């Protein structure tokens, strides 16, 4: 015999086909009748030749003990002197061989062995590979390697076809099948086990086509291009470790008493070994016949078919309908029994697995088939390990106990068969219950693969009933609903409540205006007082009663995506609102309530606990502590969290540019009224300044201390005042400077408020009320203005680079000059603006301070001298760049003070209109280049315009010659410099060239 390439080829006689003969036909005739054990030693010599034992054919001569002992002795002697590392010494005991005597094999077929009539999948052991000892031990089970079978080496023990065997000794009466089949298998179960091994499982695409019979793992998106290949395992010794002992086959004596265990054993078999078959046979051998208890299985070729027959489909449909009909009558014992067994019954892979089931277990099997995937294209993936099954069972039982049931996968008893998702494409629909009458199944627990939710009536006061919507685009192999969130299924209300408890706020796309500035008041308009934040104190009932929508019509606040100012923001309504909320008789913030469209800023700084830095008196109450706030920092901190509960500004759906303009456009220089203090008549203007700006401590955010957006005194000052702080002058009946282009109100509301508190006056794009009261001294206004605007000068590039008067600021967005705002081109008619110095009694020192502040750092050409130029109002009327007779050009050597400049004022020539105005004012009340207008307004004198035009022409002629001379001088200097540059550049070039050569 030729040696093989395999290292272990000498262990087996590959060219001699061993097969077992009938166990009862021939025995090894031994004197003792016992074979305690044997040893097989294989030795290869140093030359690499494999020494094999030839099998000698003897005519039915039994082997005797002397020959066996002699062969064993020779083998032992050879193994002692073996120097090869490849020697293999296998010692096995034949204790199990007593159950079935070993049969001898004869070499009668050209050195081979005739076909055996015994089982071909039994383990075969050759004793010294001799004819006397070549016996088969059928009780040792399957082979550890594939080489022990007569099949070609490329075949496996699973390829053995039991039907071609002539004799089937395991069918003989009184024979223990465990002697022929391991792990409690029988003939049919072994066939079912061997068939699908190594078959490729196709992963189908699409979603929601089926419900897996046991989906114990997280759902994953299937990849249609992936093919799962189940490898064929050769290590059969691992199987007893992974298989529980109770998965033994049920013998014929126990078949009548334990029908349920059939499916149980079948589950363990198929779940552990992962056999994806559609039809399984569970049964055992009867005593006197080769038939099995229960229904007979389908033919072998149909056992593992991937598609079910039409009759099977009809049967499955009937079973589903029966399971739904019996679902309402299910007793708790069935649920308990189902949960106690875990998913063992659900893992039964086929509808025919209910063989041998009597009447007692009909309902039990119906439950097991209820959740199994029995559609026409069902595929069963490899089930998880036993540990995963146990873990999932424990988790499911615990979840069921927490929610009031034993098992979380209790069927949806309130749904009929037409609404159950049975795993087919035809069932992929929306299940909606939009009937106006209450659902009789409401209040029951609805189960799914992911958890439970309670469809309770208490969550729906008068709203529509719950809607279970099937989302075709979300689910991948399992059920998904639109309300699914945070790992469980919720209704809309439960979902939002869960988010409220988890995050502390609601993100439901509803504007703050619609729900009364309460972020928790999403679905209940007339809700009771609820905490806005931990420090909230304002009452929402007034706003809720004024809300202009219904919950049923606008549940999610779609009507409030856009800002709509309806009855709520009328002036009269605002006035009543102030009286009710604050207990006062006067209108405190008419400007903010009707003018500013930011919905949540009205109550932003209200707090239960009064600030520690605020000024308190007897009338001070905690609710009114933070009412008047500096709104400062909105332009710098525009993207900070607008609400104390952390909701971003975007949630209120206010456009960014509108909010930016709102914050930058209102800055008043008067004092605001505060309810906690005594009335304004009891204070002088200076006292009001000291008493009313108590909230300078709010000028910086200190959220790291208390988590709220407050500001402190030693921070940078506010670039803009509070949007609700109006200029407080004399009962708030005057001195309101508005900007209609930034005022998002209707003209009717604006006129209504002005007619109520102000004098009627013409208005245009940049509204200036010419008819306002004149009882307030400009002195006090400028005093406060200078004090508030001064710290902010460093933050704006105002008019320092422009030629303008002290009060004429071209930058319309400056927060402190709302009193005099003009368009950028400065060409504004005179009647549209108002002179800032037209009031009596302001001090000259205030003018000096403002003058110095506005022009301190203005450096122009002229040997380092400060050039101060002021345009008069005639220049604004159209003669830009001209210095009128009321203006002057003055150079100071840097040391001149403002007082020295003012000494020259009386010597300045004045126009007719200024001379007329000087009769009504003190001489110290004037500033150079200023037009003093009377109350009714002064039109520009045509005579003065002509005079100014003539002077402008003279000035041009005077500087014309100077300009030409300067240009000529500059041109000559430029030519000389250019010649020198050319001369200086030529020499180095020639030198470099010479050096380079």
UniProtKB/Swiss-Prot annotation:
Composition bias, Basic and acidic residues: 309-323, 334-346, 367-379, 388-404
Molecular function (Gene Ontology), one example: RNA binding
Comp. bias (Polar residues): 261-272, 534-547
Coiled coil: 930-963
Chain segments carrying region Disordered: 250-272, 289-475, 534-553, 880-900
Swiss-Prot/TrEMBL GO biological process terms: mRNA processing
Compartment(s) where it occurs, according to its Swiss-Prot or TrEMBL record: Nucleus
The entry's keywords: Coiled coil, mRNA processing, Nucleus, RNA-binding
Chief localisation class: nucleus
Cited Pfam families: Fip1 (PF05182)
A GO cellular component entry from the record: nucleus
Superkingdom to which the source organism belongs: Eukaryota
Motif (Nuclear localization signal): 397-404
Role, per record: Component of the cleavage and polyadenylation specificity factor (CPSF) complex that plays a key role in pre-mRNA 3'-end formation, recognizing the AAUAAA signal sequence and interacting with poly(A) polymerase and other factors to bring about cleavage and poly(A) addition. FIP1L1 contributes to poly(A) site recognition and stimulates poly(A) addition. Binds to U-rich RNA sequence elements surrounding the poly(A) site. May act to tether poly(A) polymerase to the CPSF complex.
Oligomer status and interactors: Component of the cleavage and polyadenylation specificity factor (CPSF) complex. Forms a complex with cleavage and polyadenylation specificity factor (CPSF) subunits CLPS5, FIPS5, PAPS4, PCFS1, CSTF64 and CPSF30.
Family: Belongs to the FIP1 family.
UniProt cross-references to PANTHER family, sorted A to Z: FIP1[III]-LIKE PROTEIN
Protein name: FIP1[III]-like protein
Classification lineage: Eukaryota, Viridiplantae, Streptophyta, Embryophyta, Tracheophyta
Gene this chain is encoded by: FIPS3
């Amino acid at each position: 015999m030729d040696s093989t390439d395999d290292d272990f080829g000498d262990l087996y006689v590959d060219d001699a086909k061993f097969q077992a003969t009938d166990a009862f036909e021939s025995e090894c005739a031994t004197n003792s009748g016992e074979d305690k054990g044997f040893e097989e030693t294989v030795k290869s010599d140093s030359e690499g030749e494999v020494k094999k034992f030839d099998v000698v054919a003897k005519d039915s001569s039994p082997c005797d003990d002397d020959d066996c002992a002699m062969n064993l002795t020779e083998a032992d002697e050879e193994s002692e002197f073996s120097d090869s590392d490849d020697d293999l010494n296998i010692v096995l005991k034949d204790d199990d061989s007593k159950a079935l005597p070993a049969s001898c094999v004869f070499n009668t077929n050209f050195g081979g062995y005739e076909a055996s009539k015994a089982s071909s999948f039994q383990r075969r052991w050759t004793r010294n590979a001799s004819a006397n000892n070549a016996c088969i031990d059928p009780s040792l089970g399957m082979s550890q390697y594939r080489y022990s079978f007569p099949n070609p080496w490329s075949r496996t023990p699973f390829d053995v076809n039991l039907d071609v065997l002539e004799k089937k000794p395991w069918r003989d009466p009184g024979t223990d099948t465990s002697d022929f089949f391991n792990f409690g298998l029988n003939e049919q179960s072994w066939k079912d086990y061997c068939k699908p091994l190594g078959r490729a499982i196709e992963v189908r695409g699409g979603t929601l086509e089926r419900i897996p019979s046991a989906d114990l793992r997280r759902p994953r998106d299937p990849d249609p291009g992936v093919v799962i290949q189940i490898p064929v395992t050769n290590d059969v010794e691992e199987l007893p470790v992974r298989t529980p002992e109770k998965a033994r086959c049920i013998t014929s004596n126990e078949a009548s008493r334990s029908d349920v265990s059939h499916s149980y054993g079948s589950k363990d078999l198929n779940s552990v070994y992962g056999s994806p078959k559609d039809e399984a046979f569970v049964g055992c051998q009867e005593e006197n016949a080769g038939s099995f208890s229960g229904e007979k299985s389908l033919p072998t070729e149909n056992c593992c078919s991937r598609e079910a027959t039409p009759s099977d489909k009809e049967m499955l449909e009937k079973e589903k309908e029966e399971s739904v009909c019996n679902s309402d009558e299910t007793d708790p014992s069935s649920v308990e029994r189902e949960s106690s067994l875990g998913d063992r019954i659900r893992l039964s892979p086929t509808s025919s697995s209910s063989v041998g089931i009597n009447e007692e277990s009909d309902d039990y099997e119906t439950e097991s088939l209820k959740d199994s995937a029995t559609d026409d294209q069902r595929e069963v993936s490899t089930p998880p390990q036993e540990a995963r099954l146990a873990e999932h069972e424990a988790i499911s039982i615990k979840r069921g106990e927490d929610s009031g049931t034993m098992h979380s996968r209790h069927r949806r008893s309130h749904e009929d068969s037409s609404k159950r998702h049975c795993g087919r494409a035809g069932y992929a629909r929306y299940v909606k219950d939009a009937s106006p009458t209450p659902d009789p199944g409401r209040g029951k627990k609805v189960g799914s693969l992911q958890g439970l939710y309670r469809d309770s009536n208490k969550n729906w006061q008068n709203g529509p009933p719950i809607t279970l919507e099937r989302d075709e685009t979300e689910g991948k192999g399992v059920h998904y609903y639109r309300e699914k969130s945070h790992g469980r299924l919720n209704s809309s209300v439960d979902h939002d409540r869960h988010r409220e408890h988890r995050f502390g706020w609601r993100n439901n796309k509803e504007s703050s205006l619609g729900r009364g500035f309460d972020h928790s008041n999403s679905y209940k308009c007339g809700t009771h007082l609820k905490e806005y934040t931990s420090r909230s104190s304002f009452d929402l009932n007034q706003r809720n009663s004024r809300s202009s929508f219904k919950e049923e019509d606008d549940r999610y606040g779609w009507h409030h995506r856009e800002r709509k100012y309806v009855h709520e923001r009328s002036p009269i309504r605002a006035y009543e609102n102030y009286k009710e909320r604050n207990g006062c008789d006067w209108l405190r913030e008419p400007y903010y309530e009707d003018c500013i469209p930011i919905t949540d800023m009205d109550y932003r700084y209200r707090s239960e606990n009064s600030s520690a830095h605020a000024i308190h008196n007897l009338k001070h109450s905690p609710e009114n502590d933070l009412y008047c706030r500096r709104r400062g920092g909105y332009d710098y901190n525009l993207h900070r969290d607008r609400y104390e509960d952390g909701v971003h500004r975007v949630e209120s759906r206010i456009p960014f540019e509108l909010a930016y303009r709102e914050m930058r456009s209102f800055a008043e220089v008067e004092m605001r009224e505060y309810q906690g203090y005594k009335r304004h008549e009891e204070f002088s203007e200076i006292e009001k300044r000291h008493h009313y700006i108590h909230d300078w401590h709010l000028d910086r955010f200190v959220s790291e201390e208390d988590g709220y957006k407050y500001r402190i005194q030693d921070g940078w000052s506010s670039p803009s005042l509070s949007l609700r702080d109006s200029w407080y002058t004399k009962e708030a009946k005057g001195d309101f400077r508005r900007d209609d282009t930034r005022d998002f109100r209707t003209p009717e509301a604006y006129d209504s408020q002005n007619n109520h508190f102000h004098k009627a006056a013409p208005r245009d794009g940049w509204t200036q009320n010419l008819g306002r009261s004149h009882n307030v001294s400009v002195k006090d206004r400028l005093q406060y203005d200078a004090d508030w605007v001064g710290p902010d000068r460093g933050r704006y590039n105002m008019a320092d680079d422009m030629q303008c008067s002290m009060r004429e600021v071209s930058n319309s967005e400056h927060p402190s000059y709302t009193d005099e705002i003009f368009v950028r081109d400065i060409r504004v008619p005179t009647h549209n603006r108002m002179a800032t110095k037209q009031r009596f009694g302001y001090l000259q020192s205030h003018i000096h301070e403002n003058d110095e502040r506005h022009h301190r750092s203005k450096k122009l050409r002229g040997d380092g001298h400060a050039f101060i130029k002021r345009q008069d109002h005639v220049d604004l009327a159209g003669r830009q760049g001209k210095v009128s007779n009321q203006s002057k050009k003055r150079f100071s050597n840097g040391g001149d003070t403002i007082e020295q400049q003012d000494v020259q004022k009386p010597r300045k020539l004045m126009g007719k209109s200024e001379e007329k105005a000087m009769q009504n004012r003190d001489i110290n009340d004037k500033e150079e280049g200023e037009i003093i207008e009377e109350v009714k307004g002064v039109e520009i004198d045509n005579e003065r315009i002509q005079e100014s035009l003539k002077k402008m022409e003279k000035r041009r002629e005077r500087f014309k010659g100077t300009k030409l001379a300067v240009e000529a001088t500059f041109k000559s200097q430029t030519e000389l410099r250019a010649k020198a540059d050319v001369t200086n550049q030529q020499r180095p070039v020639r030198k470099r060239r010479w050096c380079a050569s």
